[in-house]
């Protein structure tokens, strides 16, 4: 596994440590995040949690696509994978402790999902954001859509998901994907974490709880319809073509079936 969990004073750090692959998140890393969060949640000395990627090239380029054939190659395996992903994201969002994403370089796909599950997001000018699901024929999960909608709204979510393009740091700031773009990201984030650690934990938890309750959807989405759409995409020839094209380093030829 290439996930590091570190404790520095009152801050618990979770580090994606696979710089040769732009900190892509493999299966072992996904499975390690929720237990790491539980460990930090239980530690009374830890007041906040921070996520970062090793090096400066990437926070995380997303899920390790080299594993897609084995971990997401069928409708059933996609469902299992999405269940694991939901568990990971809820472990971050539902933590009683505030979380911060410190973003350098690429923050794509699953990496962006993790950042969106954090309470606060700060990035360097080098940061690039995006969700390339449409370029891979991939069915993006329900929780990922929900968090993106809550963060940037319906119009921006449509553009991000339909086009699959990348956005620079200033564009991400303008649409609300990040809270600030800062020149000295590490020292700025360290100061934010120091401020969080010094503030009253129960006061932060109170606000976190109230905010989460208010952003919950007041409607009743048709979950069966959403899951059917995911399954249809996961079983499609286009999804197989997207995976093959990525591994063969060519443009995919999607047929809509």
Per-region residue spans from a language model:
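Acidic, divalent-metal-coordinating active-site segment for phosphoryl/phosphodiester hydrolysis
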Residues: 165-171
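Conserved CoA-thioester-binding segment of acyl-CoA-metabolizing enzymes
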Residues: 1-52, 90
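CoA-thioester-processing core
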Residues: 88-94, 102, 108-161, 174-175, ...
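Glycine- (often His-adjacent) and acidic-residue-rich active-site loop
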Residues: 45, 53-91, 137, 218
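C-terminal long alpha-helix characteristic of the crotonase
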Residues: 122-127, 178-224, 231, 235-237, ...
């Amino acid at each position: 596994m290439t996930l590091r969990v570190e404790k520095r004073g009152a801050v618990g750090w979770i580090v994606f440590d696979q710089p040769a692959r732009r900190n892509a998140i493999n299966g072992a890393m996904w499975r390690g995040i929720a237990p790491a969060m539980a460990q930090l949640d239980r530690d009374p000395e830890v007041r906040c949690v921070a996520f970062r990627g090793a090096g400066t090239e990437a926070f995380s380029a997303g899920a390790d696509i080299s594993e897609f054939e084995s971990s997401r190659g069928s409708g059933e395996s996609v469902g299992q994978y999405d269940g694991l992903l939901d568990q990971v994201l809820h472990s971050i969002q539902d933590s009683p402790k505030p979380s911060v994403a410190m973003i350098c370089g690429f923050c794509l796909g699953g990496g962006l999902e993790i950042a969106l599950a954090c309470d606060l997001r700060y990035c360097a000018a080098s940061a690039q954001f995006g969700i390339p699901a449409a370029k891979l024929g991939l069915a993006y999960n329900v929780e990922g859509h929900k968090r993106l909608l809550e963060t940037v709204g319906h119009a921006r979510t449509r553009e991000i998901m339909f086009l699959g393009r990348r956005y620079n740091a200033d564009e991400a700031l303008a649409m609300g994907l990040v809270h600030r773009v800062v020149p000295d990201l590490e020292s700025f984030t360290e100061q934010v974490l120091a401020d969080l650690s010094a503030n009253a934990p129960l006061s932060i938890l109170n606000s976190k709880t109230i905010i989460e309750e208010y952003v919950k959807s007041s409607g009743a989405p048709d979950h069966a319809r959403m899951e059917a759409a995911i399954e249809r995409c996961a079983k499609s020839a286009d999804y197989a073509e997207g995976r093959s094209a990525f591994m063969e380093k060519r443009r995919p030829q999607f047929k809509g079936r």
